[in-house]
């Protein structure tokens, strides 16, 4: 059985009071790297190894210019996001249970990047193919 992993941006948050208090640019705003609804497909086989390349060119759906989205053809995933999602992507690509017992479906995980003033929320989903 072959496995792919789909990552979807399902939310973006902003905490302006924290940006005002702690950020060098107190008006930095929402994360510029991702958009709600962005979708990425990761494969790892003889032709592709998206995991090894930090998710470069895994973007399959966006409402923005693909060249400006992390994971698009021009830039790999943001390091803060990659740190949050890569372990689940790797597990899914190997056919493993992403979060058995915690999530309703063991092939899914909801996680977010570690930017505390403007986190991005991701759904990571293992897709099983014959």
Task: Place the predicted regions along the sequence by residue.
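Short, structured beta-strand/loop micro-motifs enriched in basic residues and often containing a Trp
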Residues: 3-5, 12-25
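A short, structured loop/turn motif at beta-sheet edges
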Residues: 1-4, 34-39, 129
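Beta-strand secondary-structure signal
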Residues: 4-8, 121-123
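Short, compact, well-ordered microdomains
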Residues: 79-130
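Short, Lys/Arg- and Gly-enriched loop/turn segments at beta-strand edges
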Residues: 47-80
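Residue-level signal for secondary-structure boundary sites
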Residues: 15-17, 50, 130
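Beta-strand elements of well-folded, non-transmembrane domains
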Residues: 9-13, 126-128
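Short, flexible N-terminal segments of the mature chain
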Residues: 21-48
């Amino acid at each position: 059985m072959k496995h792919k992993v789909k990552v979807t941006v399902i939310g973006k948050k902003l905490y302006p009071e924290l940006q005002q208090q702690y950020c060098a640019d107190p008006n930095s705003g929402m994360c510029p790297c991702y958009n709600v609804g962005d979708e990425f497909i990761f494969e790892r086989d003889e032709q592709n190894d998206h995991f090894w390349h930090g998710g470069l060119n895994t973007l399959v759906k966006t409402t923005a210019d693909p060249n400006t989205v992390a994971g698009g053809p021009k830039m790999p995933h943001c390091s803060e996001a990659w740190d949050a999602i890569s372990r689940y992507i790797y597990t899914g690509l190997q056919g493993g249970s992403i979060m058995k017992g915690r999530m309703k479906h063991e092939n899914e995980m909801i996680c977010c990047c570690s930017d505390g003033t403007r986190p991005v929320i991701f759904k990571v989903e293992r897709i099983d193919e014959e």
